[in-house]
Amino acid sequence: MHETSLGTTLTDYLSGESIDETTYESFRQALARLLVEERGYPKDRLKAKQDICYEIDGEPFHRPIDIVVYDPDNRPVLLVMFCSGSVGSYEREASVAARLFPGGPAPLAVVTDTTSAALLDAAGGGVLAEGMNAIPRWRQLLEMAAERRAEPLTEEQRDRLVRIFHTYSGFLFGACCQDCRPTRG
């Protein structure tokens, strides 16, 4: 299932603005509510649909990340990616996205289908915890992120990771996902 517009709007939980309702937007909204209301994240530390921009052979692309959580110093510490399939099959993509994220790398990532989740150590690789309870509370997130500060990528590392990320994301470009397309002038 790809994300498509439903032709209506809804009020965004995080910003209060009217946004396009899509096949995934209700999941994104539920994840934002869970983070704020159940896990104690300050609402102003979450940003929805934040882009990772990159180039492949000179052609620009961008891919939105569902929710990015920023620490009090405005550094990305957690990327949350919704998946419409097996959580395990999205783990590598989410880890790579966290390492490539602007202002990062973000040390942690969560991939979830809203019934299951995996908390990932983006820099070290691997799954730290599974299940919806794996999503840390705010204070716990800050502690975990401080323990896992990732070094900035070298240009060679970034180039390699961009190709991996594009391979995972590339099937979306030109498909029905309006938010995930090559950026053209």
Go through the PLM ranges and name each one.
Residues 110:
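A short glycine-rich, hydrophobically flanked beta-strand micro-motif that places a catalytic Asp/Glu
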